[in-house]
Amino acid sequence: GEGLRAPRCAERSLSYADSFIELIEKNKSNFFVHKINKYPNLLEIEKIFKNYRDKNIDLVLSIGGGSVIDAGKLFSSCKTSGSKLNDISNLKNRSPQNSIFTIAIPTTSGSGAESTKFATIWSEETKQKFSYENENLLPEVVYLIPEYTKSLNYDLTLTTTLDALCHAVDSLLNKNSNHESIRLSKEAIEKTNSNFSLLLENLENIDYRAEALYAS
């Protein structure tokens, strides 16, 4: 067959993405690479849709931070394999059967975008932030690779870990919380509290990176 067709969303200048390109090339798969800006806006997402409107996509692989992963989630949910683009505004009416298989690989340990059914995008024209919710926004597969977070400097490690902690506290105190969400929130808070200072003092430590990534 023609092999795999996968538009990959990745942040600019990330050398670790080269390993995936090499792997796909060795397997003689057809793929398309699309690098997006750090903070993609609605126009950029629409540009991605336009570029791949007539492509038969079987897989979306997103490697990067929350914005990159959200972009991949929106793309896979609004473009069915073998079909044309569907309007983002109609996303909430889409069924899970109409999404493309998605793999997310986070390179930060903050927002946890890889494990949610939400996606957020900024509109430069209206100066508004849009949030979308749909079950089919949740990636089918997530790989947590702590080595990919080693490039985060002290400040980014600090801010993203605090971001994860804030999400956990917010989930714990949410009026719609349940036994499972409370359990996960407490686990995330405990892991962050026991690991945070150690990670900041040892940014190269893979074990601490792994704990932070899991907590997020």
Which functions belong to the PLM regions below?
Residues 81-179:
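A glycine/threonine-rich phosphate-anchoring loop and its flanking beta-alpha core
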Residues 1-59:
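ATP/NTP phosphate-donor binding region
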Residues 171-216:
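Active-site segments that bind and position negatively charged phosphate/pyrophosphate groups
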Residues 49, 68-81, 115-118:
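Short Gly/Thr/Asp-enriched flexible loops that form oxyanion-binding sites at enzyme active sites
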Residues 12, 37-40, 153, 157, ...:
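Catalytic cores of large soluble enzymes that bind and process phosphate-bearing ligands
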Residues 32-34, 61, 71, 104-105, ...:
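General beta-strand structural signal in soluble alpha/beta enzymes
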Residues 57-73, 107-113:
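Glycine/serine-rich anion-binding loops at beta->alpha junctions
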